[in-house]
Design a protein with these regions (language model features):
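C-terminal motif of bacterial Sec signal peptides marking the signal peptidase cleavage site
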Residues: 40-41
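Functional-site microenvironments in short loops/helix caps that host divalent-cation chemistry
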Residues: 46-52, 74-75, 81, 86, ...
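Short, structured beta-strand segments at or near domain termini in extracellular proteins/domains
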Residues: 473-488
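Non-catalytic, alpha-helical, charged scaffold/linker segments
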Residues: 136-246
Length: 488
C-alpha cells in the first residue's frame, strides 16, 4: 500500500511539472511511464526491496560447472551393502556388512601408471635442482627464486618455474648444482638419480579436526583450558636425514591443525626381490619402473605415504594452473574403502566382481582380469606380473582393472571391526599414526586384489591390509576427487 501511494504521488508531481512546462499530453505519458518504470525497478533491487515483503534470498552468483578431469570418470552417488557378510574360510570369522551411501566423486579410469608417477618424480627432481640453482652454495642465480611481486613488494620466496634448467651449455656452477642430485653406481658406472634425495614436503590443514566440539570453545575464546592436540611436523637434519614426528602439546591456535610431512617419493624397486626371495626377479628390479616398455603399467612398490604425497602434489600441480582463473577445485586424495567398493561394484550390492557376474571367465572362455587362477598359474590370463592398464574391459562406470592387476591403497585405516566403526553416510575411518606406533595401528585397507591373488581375493567386497610404510610389488593406487556441487 505504501509503495502504491508513493507511486501515485510521483505520478501527480510529474504531471504537474510537465503541464507547467507546456509539454504536450502524448509526450507527458511517455515521460511519466519512463519515470515510474525507473522507480519500480529501483524498488526491486537489493535486500531491502519491496517484493510484497517476501523472503526472496540473495543472488546466488555464478555456479561453476566442473568439467570432467583428465583421465577420470564420474562415480554417481549411490547406496550398497558394504562387505561380503560371509564366514572367512580360514579363521571362521563372519565379516560384517553395512548399508552405506556415498556422494558423487571423480575416479581415475586406471591405476596410476609408471609414466604418470614419473611425472611426480621429475617434478620433485626439478624443484630440488631449482632450489640449488638459487642457493649461493651452488649457482646462486636469483632468477630461480621469486621474492617480490610485480609491484616490487616482498612475497614469500618461491620457485620460478618459468626459467628453464640449463641441462646443456651450462656454467660450471650450474653443472655442479645439477650433478649434486645424481650419483654413479660403484659397480656398473651408470649415472643415476640419487633416489635418497627425492623428498617431497607438503602441508595440510585438518579442517575436520579443527571443527570438533572439544576444540572450538578454546579457539573461540570461551574456554581457557587448552586441550591436548597431536601435530605432525617434519624437518631435515644437517646431515640430510628426514625426521617426521608427532608432537602432543596443548592447543595454542588454529595453526596447530596445520601438519607437515616430508616423504621420500621414489618407489621401492627392490620389492621385486624382497617380496619373492627365492625367485629370479632381478630383471623387474632393474626395468619395471625404469624401462619405457613398462610406462603404461601400474606403478607398484609405492607406500601408502608415497601415494598420499602423490595426491597432494597432484592437487598442488592442478591448483597452480586453475586458481589463476579464479577456479577452486577439490583436492585429489586416495579413495575411502566405501568409495572404492561402491565404484568397483557398480553401486550394486549383488555384484561381487566389477563385471557383474560370479564367473571369472567370459562366455568365450577368456579371463576377465589379471589374477592367479590356480597354484603357480600366473600366466594363465596371458600376463605374468602387472599388465598394461586397460588390458581388460572396464566396468559400467568406465573403470579399468578394479579386480586384479594391482591391489590398491585406500585412505581407510584397517581394523578387524571393519565398517562397524564407520558412519553409514560417506563412511570413513582414518587415523594418523606416528613412526614409532605399533604395527597394527599403521595398517591401511587395500582393495581389489592383484595379479598374484586367487579369485576369492580379487572380489570387490573383500578387503586386505598393509602397513602404510611398506611398498609391495602387488600394490598400486588410483586417485579420487569429490565432485563440486552444482556440476552436471
Amino acid at each position: 500500500m505504501c509503495q502504491l501511494l508513493s507511486n501515485r504521488r510521483m505520478y501527480k508531481i510529474a504531471t504537474e511539472e510537465l503541464t507547467a512546462k507546456n509539454i504536450k499530453p502524448m509526450k507527458q505519458y511517455l515521460i511519466i511511464i519512463l519515470i515510474l518504470g525507473a522507480a519500480l525497478s529501483c524498488g526491486r533491487r537489493g535486500i531491502g526491496s519491496s517484493v510484497g515483503g517476501e523472503l526472496t534470498g540473495i543472488s546466488v552468483g555464478r555456479v561453476w560447472d566442473e568439467p570432467t578431469p583428465y583421465n577420470m570418470v564420474l562415480v554417481t552417488r549411490g547406496s550398497i551393502t558394504m562387505g561380503p557378510g560371509e564366514t572367512d574360510s580360514l579363521w571362521g570369522i563372519t565379516i560384517p556388512t553395512r548399508g552405506i551411501s556415498v556422494d558423487n566423486f571423480w575416479m581415475d579410469e586406471t591405476e596410476i601408471t609408471n609414466s604418470q608417477y614419473k611425472q611426480f618424480v621429475y617434478w620433485v627432481r626439478d624443484s630440488i635442482i631449482r632450489e640449488r640453482m638459487a642457493d649461493p652454495r651452488y649457482a646462486g642465480d636469483d632468477f630461480y627464486k621469486i621474492t617480490e611481486d610485480a609491484y616490487g613488494d616482498p612475497v614469500t620466496p618461491h620457485l620460478n618455474w618459468s626459467v628453464p634448467i640449463p641441462w646443456t651449455r651450462n656454467t660450471e656452477e650450474e653443472e655442479a648444482a645439477i650433478n649434486s642430485l645424481y650419483k654413479t653406481h660403484p659397480i656398473t658406472g651408470v649415472k643415476m638419480l640419487d633416489a635418497t634425495q627425492l623428498n617431497f614436503r607438503y602441508e595440510w590443514f585438518d579442517e575436520a579436526m579443527a571443527a570438533r566440539n572439544e576444540y572450538r570453545p578454546f579457539l573461540e575464546g570461551t574456554a581457557t583450558n587448552a586441550p591436548l592436540i597431536s601435530k605432525d611436523t617434519a624437518f631435515v637434519t644437517p646431515d640430510g636425514q628426514v625426521v617426521n614426528q608427532t608432537l602432543t602439546r596443548p592447543l595454542s591456535s588454529l595453526y596447530d591443525f596445520v601438519h607437515t610431512r616430508i616423504v621420500n617419493i621414489y618407489p621401492d624397486t627392490t620389492c621385486w626381490v624382497n617380496d619373492f626371495p627365492q625367485a629370479h626377479n632381478e630383471y623387474y628390479l632393474r626395468n619395471y619402473f625404469a624401462n619405457p616398455a613398462y610406462a603404461h603399467h601400474p606403478v607398484v612398490g609405492v607406500t601408502w605415504e608415497q601415494a598420499t604425497a602423490f595426491c597432494e602434489w597432484r592437487t598442488l600441480f592442478l591448483r597452480r594452473s586453475v586458481n589463476k582463473a579464479g577456479v577452486q577445485v577439490e583436492r585429489y586424495r586416495l579413495p575411502t574403502e566405501a568409495e572404492w567398493e561402491l565404484a568397483a561394484r557398480n553401486a550394486n550390492s549383488d555384484n561381487r566382481y566389477p563385471w557383474g557376474s560370479d564367473a571369472t571367465t567370459s562366455e568365450s572362455g577368456c579371463y576377465q582380469a589379471n589374477f592367479n587362477p590356480g597354484e603357480g598359474a600366473y600366466a594363465a590370463d596371458n600376463h605374468l606380473i602387472p599388465a598394461k592398464v586397460r588390458s581388460f574391459k572396464p566396468n559400467q562406470f568406465g573403470l579399468y582393472d578394479m579386480a586384479g592387476n594391482a591391489a590398491e591403497w585406500t585412505s581407510t585405516s584397517y581394523t578387524a571391526s571393519g565398517n562397524a566403526l564407520m558412519s553409514d553416510l560417506n563412511p570413513e575411518y582414518s587415523t594418523r599414526v606416528a613412526a614409532d606406533d605399533p604395527t597394527p595401528l599403521k595398517r591401511k585397507v587395500v582393495k581389489g586384489g592383484s595379479w598374484k591373488d586367487i579369485a576369492t581375493f580379487i572380489r570387490s567386497d573383500m578387503r586386505d591390509s598393509e602397513e602404510n610404510d611398506k611398498g609391495r610389488s602387488w600394490i598400486g593406487f588410483r586417485c579420487v576427487r569429490t565432485q563440486t556441487a552444482g556440476s552436471r
